[in-house]
């Protein structure tokens, strides 16, 4: 482990001091640290920043300071390089960010000593076809969501799986999620929880007008097609709640398992069900 990339969500409070301390400690261990652009600005050296995508190409692993959202963004941008990432938690307990700042130095010592393993997560690829032409294509880790956005009107959608008609319905939208994404928006919309070590896809309608429209778990080899039917107001595609694209009547959105995977560097054995149990307690008790 010679070079570590650094991605910091600078909106998560005053983190510059602990970040600098970790960088200094890594330098003592002869570990080189590269920064993405936002992190370089935070540290007062904007000229040294490179894109997160470039970090993936130049580093052995990437250390992400933030919450699950920051980690999702990094996973999308570095998926093509296959560089493993790990999260330092700056907020509430997350499903993906597993290291707290007080434990970080101990975990980094284990990392440098080679005491880690790589956990791979299935990703999705979404392709937007308009007038027979591909107008956008991107990968996501959690979910691809076709929804009405800020409009008050429902959208009319048609769903096919492997070119087989599943159904048409009026709803606020539809979520196509990975197992990792099953504990995100899909769960709030009534979808089931899928263990992240499985490979599957999940189709979850968002507030459908009919009670007969239920979530469906399908094979990871499946190809999902969402068609935007006439008489829609405003509808858009959103990936991981971060990357968005306005859609038009007649657009076809194709969603399938991506050829790349998110790779998480695990320094400690954290059980998914331990984290799930704590998150469910948190949601039950409400947020402060």
UniProtKB/Swiss-Prot annotation:
It is found in: Cytoplasm. The lineage of its organism: Bacteria, Bacillati, Bacillota, Clostridia, Eubacteriales. Its EC number is 2.7.1.23. It catalyses: NAD(+) + ATP = ADP + NADP(+) + H(+). The keyword Chaperone does not apply. Its cofactor is a divalent metal cation. SUPFAM superfamilies: NAD kinase/diacylglycerol kinase-like. The gene is nadK. Keywords: ATP-binding, Cytoplasm, Kinase, NAD, NADP, Nucleotide-binding, Transferase. GO terms for cellular component: cytoplasm. It holds the Pfam family NAD_kinase. It comes from the Bacteria. Its main location: cytoplasm. This is NAD kinase. NAD(+) binds at residues 68-69, 142-143, 153, 172, 242. Involved in the regulation of the intracellular balance of NAD and NADP, and is a key enzyme in the biosynthesis of NADP. Catalyzes specifically the phosphorylation on 2'-hydroxyl of the adenosine moiety of NAD to yield NADP. It comes from Desulforamulus reducens (strain ATCC BAA-1160 / DSM 100696 / MI-1). GO terms for molecular function: ATP binding; metal ion binding; NAD binding; NAD+ kinase activity. Belongs to the NAD kinase family. The keyword ATP-binding applies. PANTHER family: NAD KINASE. GO terms for biological process: NAD metabolic process; NADP biosynthetic process. Gene3D superfamilies: Probable inorganic polyphosphate/atp-NAD kinase, domain 1, Probable inorganic polyphosphate/atp-NAD kinase, domain 2. The active site is at residue 68.
């Amino acid at each position: 482990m010679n070079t570590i990339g650094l991605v910091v969500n600078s909106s998560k409070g005053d983190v510059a001091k602990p970040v600098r301390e970790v960088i200094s400690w890594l330098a003592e261990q002869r570990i080189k640290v590269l920064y993405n652009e936002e992190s370089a600005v935070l540290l007062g050296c904007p000229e040294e920043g490179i894109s997160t995508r470039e970090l993936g190409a130049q580093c052995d692993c990437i250390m992400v300071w933030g919450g699950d959202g920051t980690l999702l963004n990094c996973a999308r941008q570095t998926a093509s390089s296959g560089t493993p990432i790990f999260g330092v938690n700056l907020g509430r307990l997350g499903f993906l960010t597993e290291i707290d700042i007080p434990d970080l130095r101990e975990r980094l010592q284990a990392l440098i000593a080679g005491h880690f393993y790589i956990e791979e997560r299935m990703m999705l690829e979404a392709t937007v076809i308009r007038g027979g032409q591909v107008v956008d294509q991107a990968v996501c880790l959690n979910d691809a969501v076709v929804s009405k956005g800020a409009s008050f009107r429902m959208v009319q959608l048609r769903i096919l799986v492997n070119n087989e008609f599943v159904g048409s319905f009026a709803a606020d939208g539809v979520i196509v999620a990975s197992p990792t994404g099953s504990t995100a928006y899909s769960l709030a919309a009534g979808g089931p929880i899928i263990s992240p070590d499985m490979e599957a896809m999940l189709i979850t309608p968002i507030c459908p007008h009919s009670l007969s429209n239920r979530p469906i778990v399908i094979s990871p080899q499946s190809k999902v097609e969402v068609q935007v039917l006439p008489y829609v107001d405003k509808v858009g595609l959103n990936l991981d709640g971060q990357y968005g694209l306005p859609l038009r009547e007649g657009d076809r959105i194709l969603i399938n398992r991506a050829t790349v995977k998110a790779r998480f560097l695990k320094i400690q054995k954290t059980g998914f069900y331990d984290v799930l149990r704590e998150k469910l307690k948190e949601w039950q008790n409400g947020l402060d």
